[in-house]
Curated annotation (Swiss-Prot):
Outcome when changing residue 24 to A: No nuclear localization
Annotated phenotype, changing residue 50 to A: No nuclear localization
Nucleus in keyword set: yes
Impact upon substituting residue 53 to A: No nuclear localization
Region (Disordered): 63-92
UniProt: Zn(2+) binding residues: 11, 14, 23, 25
Biased composition (Low complexity): 69-92
Database matches in InterPro entries: Copper_Homeo_Regul, Cu_fist_DNA-bd_dom, Cu_fist_DNA-bd_dom_sf
Molecular function GO labels: copper ion binding; DNA-binding transcription activator activity, RNA polymerase II-specific; DNA-binding transcription factor activity, RNA polymerase II-specific; RNA polymerase II cis-regulatory region sequence-specific DNA binding
Subcellular location: Cytoplasm; Nucleus
GO terms under cellular component: cytoplasm; nucleus
Full protein name: Metal-binding regulatory protein cuf1
Alphabetical list of PANTHER family matching this protein: TRANSCRIPTIONAL ACTIVATOR HAA1-RELATED
């Protein structure tokens, strides 16, 4: 096989015997090797229009004759494959030279509106017909001309939120469909402290503002329960009681309640225990404090929640996670006490349950003390002193009252 002016040549016997690639005959007449595939049936102008404008029509340049080229005067530089595929006359011997493409200035005998008009509707472009298409055979985006006749691809259908806001991300239901919910999650959804589903759209928390935030908040809502934004506090929900028990054992946070409580973190960093799921619709929580429920808005006002707990009043918080001006660097498995980024970790909930259990015992002891004192006063009609009350009350033992103040025997 001999290459002359970027055209592969071989003798006729080797071409017919399918040995054109190994042909080394120099004493025979050589002929150009036709490329594989179907022959070109369109002129150069129609081929460019087929690619750039998607005009899949038959070439109407029927005035073209064999051995002539139907093209206008242009300076289009075609590669070797396009030159060999053209229908121009090709020299039949080595002695003849191929004319350069820039000097070809032939015209159709009869001008056609689709081929050889005086004012072509498409300007000549320097396009490589083989390398300027993608893997699907479509022209690349950077090579597509900006014209009104170009057919744009349809945009993908966008999802819309519940209140009509456009969202290009998946709905929140599809993100959390395969996530395991806590065992008492249905009880939480029935509680009067949940976020209403029919409040106005201007206070609807939009999950579609960022794909990263939407996925992260969807996962947190599936594990810890949906956050409450209306009344200024966030529900801290953790269904893993084993992790809370392990954290309590590690840090010796005893006593603990029989069932871990659910807490709400206020905007100022305080924590408030919420009613348990067994007393969801009751007038008071497990501590006996009444909670004001607004029936019109179906949420709890944070000003009526009992005894806000501040962890810094009970524990030393050396971790930077508990500081308001620092971000957590521990990741999703953070177990730092009082972490503001992960307030529902097992260590924080174990400490809150420990403080709540102590306050509950103090409240119950105080109530029993006042009840016992009232009964004694009503029966004896006189007020007992502290020493007499300490000696007669079963709540005060040697660990809580100094031994010198305890009297033995009956009063």
């Amino acid at each position: 096989m001999v290459v002359i002016n970027n055209v592969k040549m071989a003798c006729m016997k080797c071409i017919r015997g399918h040995r054109s690639s190994t042909c080394k005959h120099n004493d025979r007449e050589l002929f150009p090797i036709r490329p594989k595939g179907r022959p070109i049936s369109q002129c150069e102008k129609c081929r460019i229009a087929r690619i750039t404008r998607h005009l899949h029509v038959k070439c109407t340049c029927n005035s073209r004759k064999k051995g002539s080229k139907c093209s206008t005067s242009s300076t289009t530089d075609l590669d070797s494959s396009s030159a060999s595929n053209s229908s121009c006359s090709i020299p039949s011997s080595i002695s003849e030279k191929l004319l350069p493409r820039d000097n070809v200035k032939t015209h159709c005998p009869k001008r056609s509106a689709s081929c050889c008009g005086k004012k072509p509707d498409v300007m000549p472009l320097k396009i490589n017909l083989e390398s300027q298409t993608d893997f699907m055979g479509m022209p690349l985006q950077s090579q597509r001309p900006h014209s009104e006749s170009y057919r744009m691809l349809p945009e993908p259908e966008k999802f819309k939120s519940e209140y009509g806001y456009p969202s290009q991300f998946l709905p929140i239901e599809k993100l959390t469909s395969n996530v395991a919910y806590p065992p008492n999650y249905n009880n939480y959804l029935k509680s009067p402290y949940q976020q209403p589903t029919n409040f106005p759209p201007e206070i609807q928390y939009n999950y579609s503002h960022s794909p990263q935030h939407s996925i992260q908040e969807a996962e947190e809502a599936a594990v810890y329960g949906p956050p409450v934004y209306r009344s200024g506090y966030q529900i801290l929900y953790n269904n893993n009681t084993d992790s809370i028990a392990a954290a309590a054992a590690t840090h010796d946070l005893y006593p603990q309640p029989d069932v871990p409580l659910t807490f709400a973190m206020l905007a100022d960093g305080n924590y408030v225990p919420l009613p348990s799921s067994t007393n969801t619709y009751g007038p008071s929580n497990s501590y006996g404090y009444e909670i004001n429920i607004n029936e019109s808005t179906n949420h709890v006002d944070s000003s009526y929640l009992p005894h806000p707990i501040q962890l810094s009043n009970y524990f030393t918080l050396p971790s930077s996670c508990a500081q308001a001006d620092a971000a957590c660097q521990c990741g999703d498995n953070c177990e730092c006490l009082g972490c503001l980024t992960h307030p529902n970790n097992a260590t924080t909930l174990a400490a809150l349950n420990h403080i709540s259990a102590l306050e509950k015992e103090t409240i119950s002891h105080t109530d029993l003390h006042h009840t016992f004192k009232h009964e004694v006063n009503s029966s004896n009609n006189y007020e007992l002193t502290n020493d007499e009350l300490a000696a007669s009350s079963p709540l005060y033992t040697s660990s809580s009252v100094p031994p010198s103040h305890i009297t033995t025997g009956s009063t």
